[in-house]
Design a protein with these regions (language model features):
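Charge-rich, low-complexity N-terminal segments
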Residues: 1-55
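Short acidic-glycine loop/turn motifs at beta-strand connectors
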Residues: 27-30, 74-76, 108-112
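A short, polar/proline- and glycine-enriched secondary-structure boundary/capping micro-motif
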Residues: 43-49, 93-94, 124-128
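Phosphate/ribose-recognition catalytic cores of enzymes acting on nucleotide-derived substrates
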Residues: 48-90, 96, 100-103
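A hydrophobic, small-residue-rich beta->alpha segment in the mid-to-C-terminal subdomain
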Residues: 101-145
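Cysteine/selenocysteine-centered motifs that mediate thiol-based redox chemistry or coordinate metal-sulfur cofactors
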Residues: 142-173
Length: 173
């Protein structure tokens, strides 16, 4: 692995919001996982805060409507997961594009789960404009909640297996 990618986070209509580099640590037909550093200062996301220097292990699935970022402090302590409900990503050469649908899920190692930005999701009016995308987003939210509740990858560290190995490696189906 070790390939550098540029990640392009786009809004729900495909317009780029931000971009940054990451290093691929796993890649197969199901998706890819990359490592990136948070460089945007402190940001309170609900159940935890993102801090300058935090490491993200970002898992993107090519056929799922969500992605998951395992967030660790600069010292390696697991803060939790930030999950984006999003259209499946597009890999174009060394560029990864994903369209954020605003709805997010925050999960902490103790198992607490918080849905955030549901007001922004409703404001997109996907239920009226794109009923299929709306249904996929709600299904993705339920899928992530079930995976977290079952301590299944990429949330296996909820079982207390904090050995430092990447939870997103071995993407599976």
């Amino acid at each position: 692995m070790g390939q550098r990618l540029v990640v392009h986070k786009c809004d729900s209509e495909g317009h780029e919001v931000t971009s940054y580099e990451g290093m691929v640590v796993a890649n197969d037909e199901h998706g890819l996982t990359l490592r990136a550093r948070w460089a945007q200062g402190t940001c309170d996301v609900g159940l935890f805060a993102l801090e300058e220097g935090d490491t993200f292990l970002e898992t993107y699935y090519f056929h799922r409507w969500w992605n998951a970022f395992e967030v660790r402090s600069a010292a390696g302590r697991l803060r939790g997961w930030y999950c984006n409900i999003a259209r499946p990503p597009r890999l174009v050469g060394r560029d990864l594009y994903w369209d954020d649908l605003a709805l997010d899920l925050i999960i902490v190692p103790a198992g607490q789960v918080q849905v955030v930005d549901d007001d922004e999701f409703r404001a997109l009016r996907l239920d009226e404009r794109e009923p299929e995308a709306y249904a996929q987003a709600l299904q993705a939210l339920a899928e992530v909640q079930a995976l977290a509740a079952g301590h299944r990858p990429p949330f296996a560290a909820l079982d207390g297996m904090l050995d430092g190995s990447p939870a997103g490696a071995g993407l599976g189906g």
